[in-house]
């Protein structure tokens, strides 16, 4: 199978959407000898900050001279960036070879990518695999591990409520489902619905460490990573990872951020300039907490260009998003083409914020690199 054929097969899987249950994944992995259970896996769940925790843990392990695989989503620039070993993307032919193993399995898109990840990490002989849950926990297709080495939790908040539940407690219960008997667990500082996690840990006889609060979302994520490294016997402070579309700066005049929920908005505010007018290029998916995001970010903006994401059915139209945005910023225009929206934002010399969606970040980042 060629890389192009592998990507085409994955695109064909997109129409399957999200399907409940782990039976398809377990059956597919069983045909490989359940190689996921031959890996030392740090399994990371949460609503915000999972990618930072994963990257920081991997950084510490690499500096301790371990060979480390990382699985993190969504991708921004290259599809293969979701699966890396020692910071290098899975080679195209290796990707195609792993896809071919599962080509006839009835897997969804994300299930197929996850199966490829576990097989590639096994074939690559990684010392550790740092695996980020895609969504949720108990029902997430990464959750086919009999005995993860450590389970870690980033911040838990409301998101993906149609799939995970409409309360923080329900979401925490779903995410805590990655915990396995006897597995050490690391919790985000003052994690929401902590009793849910503690109850699960007591039931499964799991030792629990709560990271110390640092007072800043990024520092709190690093504290979680630091506790994971300590449990692994690594005496190295985690470095601050630079991740695409996570408060990513392009020069002094543009910030690209894919956060899309109220907690992500609150973290973003800490990185916005207070002494310059801000022009926001904004797109959002219709299933997000639109008002909860906009009410925090847009009062900091002088003007907003609402746009959309071509070919993304879940994206709000530019006009509908502009109507919602006018509640929080008086100067709002709609421009359906995101590239023209960026050009319009640059017209007055303001600080530019591109925000609201990883899909928008993926589209715009092509103009910036």
What is each PLM-predicted segment?
Residues 125-133, 148-234:
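Acidic, Mg2+-coordinating active-site environments of NTP-dependent enzymes
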Residues 1-46, 53, 59-66, 71, ...:
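Short functional linear segments
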Residues 10, 47, 68, 130, ...:
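Residue-level signal for inorganic ion chemistry
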Residues 57-62, 121, 325, 368:
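Hydrophobic alpha-helical packing residues
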Residues 190-219, 294-351:
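C-terminal helical cap/extension that packs against the catalytic core
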Residues 22, 26-37, 63-146, 192-194:
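ATP-dependent carboxylate-amine ligase catalytic core
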Residues 340-369:
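A glycine-rich beta-strand to alpha-helix segment
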Residues 128-133, 139-152, 157, 213-303:
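Nucleotide phosphate-binding/pyrophosphate-handling subdomain across enzymes
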């Amino acid at each position: 199978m060629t890389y192009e054929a592998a990507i085409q097969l994955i695109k064909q899987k997109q129409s399957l959407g999200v399907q409940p249950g782990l039976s398809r994944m377990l059956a597919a992995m069983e045909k490989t000898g359940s190689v996921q259970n031959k890996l030392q896996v740090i399994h990371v769940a949460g609503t915000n900050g999972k990618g930072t925790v994963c990257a920081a843990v991997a950084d510490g392990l690499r500096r301790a001279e371990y060979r480390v695989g990382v699985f993190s989503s969504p991708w921004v620039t290259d599809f293969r960036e979701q699966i890396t070993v020692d910071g290098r993307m899975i080679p195209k032919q290796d990707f195609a070879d792993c896809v071919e193993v599962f080509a006839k399995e009835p897997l969804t898109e994300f299930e197929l990518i996850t199966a490829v990840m576990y097989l590639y990490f096994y074939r690559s002989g990684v010392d550790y695999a740092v695996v980020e849950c895609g969504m949720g926990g108990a029902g997430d297709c990464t959750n086919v591990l009999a005995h993860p080495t450590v389970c870690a939790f980033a911040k838990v908040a409301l998101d993906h409520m149609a799939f995970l539940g409409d309360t923080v407690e329900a979401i925490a219960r779903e995410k805590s489902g990655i915990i396995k008997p006897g597995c050490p667990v690391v919790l985000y500082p003052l994690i929401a619905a902590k009793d849910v996690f503690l109850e699960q840990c007591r039931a499964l006889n799991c030792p629990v460490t709560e990271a110390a609060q640092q007072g800043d979302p990024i520092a709190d994520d690093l504290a979680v990573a630091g506790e994971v490294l300590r449990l692994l016997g690594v005496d190295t402070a985690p470095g601050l990872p630079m991740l695409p579309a996570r408060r990513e700066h392009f020069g002094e005049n543009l910030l690209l951020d894919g956060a899309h929920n109220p907690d992500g908005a609150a973290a973003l505010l800490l990185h916005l300039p207070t002494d310059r007018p801000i022009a926001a290029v904004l797109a959002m998916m219709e299933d997000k907490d639109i008002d909860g995001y906009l009410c925090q970010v847009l009062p900091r903006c002088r003007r907003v260009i609402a746009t959309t994401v071509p070919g993304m059915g879940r994206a709000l139209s530019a006009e509908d998003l502009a109507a919602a945005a006018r509640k929080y910023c008086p100067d709002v225009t709609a421009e359906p083409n995101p590239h023209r929206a960026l050009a319009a934002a640059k017209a007055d010399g303001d600080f530019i914020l591109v925000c609201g969606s990883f899909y928008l970040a993926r589209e715009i980042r092509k103009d910036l690199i």
